[in-house]
């Protein structure tokens, strides 16, 4: 089984996340995409952010019964600072002989540029393949793959494009829209929208 790790705060998960994960499955050829929500200490949560419990619950609601999506909660359970090295080791040990080839690490273009500076990069980077999701194309930007190639010229490892449809939305935009009473409901799956409303999330 070919597995891809897709980490993030998912505060909240939105359609852009799901489109990228779907592209990793359909175009990059991975059998399952594991959404890995990062832990945020209750003492360090930003005002207006959702709790770890709410973020995990929204992820489960978002993926529903999609057979090639799963939620991996190891960073939430571990607590503290989330290090990719520990997550890669945990997933490799958890799936063991079921794994086919290397794990994939799904990244956005901006995050990919900073990867060589991540904690213990040399200890885990050779154990993963990198799949890069495009950010939205702007006027004069060129195509997604062409632009990403230029952006990641100095990236020290081979990578492939997820060939995803990149939507110009973000979790930050959604939180701000909720706080300011703007339209946001169609940027997230309907079960997530209903959960946010029922729980009164992001209003402060």
Curated annotation (Swiss-Prot):
Organism domain of life: Bacteria
E.C. number: 2.7.7.18
Keywords tagged on the record: ATP-binding, NAD, Nucleotide-binding, Nucleotidyltransferase, Pyridine nucleotide biosynthesis, Transferase
Cross-referenced InterPro entries: Cyt_trans-like, NadD/NMNAT, Rossmann-like_a/b/a_fold
Gene Ontology molecular functions: ATP binding; nicotinate-nucleotide adenylyltransferase activity
Enzyme class: transferase
Pathway involvement of the protein, from the record: Cofactor biosynthesis; NAD(+) biosynthesis; deamido-NAD(+) from nicotinate D-ribonucleotide: step 1/1
Pfam families on file: CTP_transf_like
Catalysis: reaction(s): nicotinate beta-D-ribonucleotide + ATP + H(+) = deamido-NAD(+) + diphosphate
Record GO biological process: NAD biosynthetic process
Family named by the database record: Belongs to the NadD family.
General function of this protein: Catalyzes the reversible adenylation of nicotinate mononucleotide (NaMN) to nicotinic acid adenine dinucleotide (NaAD).
Alphabetical list of PANTHER family matching this protein: NICOTINATE-NUCLEOTIDE ADENYLYLTRANSFERASE-RELATED, PHOSPHOPANTETHEINE ADENYLYLTRANSFERASE
Protein name: Probable nicotinate-nucleotide adenylyltransferase
Organism: Treponema pallidum (strain Nichols)
């Amino acid at each position: 089984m070919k597995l891809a790790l897709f980490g993030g705060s998912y505060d909240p998960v939105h359609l852009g996340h799901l489109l990228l994960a779907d592209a990793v499955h359909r175009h990059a050829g991975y059998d399952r995409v594991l959404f890995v929500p990062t832990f945020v200490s209750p003492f360090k949560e930003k005002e207006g952010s959702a709790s770890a419990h709410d973020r995990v619950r929204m992820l489960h609601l978002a993926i529903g019964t999609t057979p090639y999506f799963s939620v991996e909660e190891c960073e939430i359970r571990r607590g503290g600072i989330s290090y990719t090295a520990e997550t890669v080791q945990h997933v490799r040990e958890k799936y063991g002989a079921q794994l086919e080839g290397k794990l994939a690490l799904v990244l956005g273009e901006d995050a990919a540029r900073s990867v060589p500076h991540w904690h213990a990069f040399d200890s885990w980077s050779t154990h993963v393949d990198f799949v890069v999701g495009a950010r939205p194309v702007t006027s004069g930007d060129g195509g997604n793959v062409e632009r990403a190639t230029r952006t990641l010229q100095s990236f020290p490892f081979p990578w492939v494009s997820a060939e995803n449809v990149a939507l110009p939305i973000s979790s930050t935009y959604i939180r701000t829209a909720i706080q300011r009473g703007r339209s946001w409901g169609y940027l997230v799956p309907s079960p997530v929208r209903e959960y946010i409303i029922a729980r009164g999330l992001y209003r402060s």
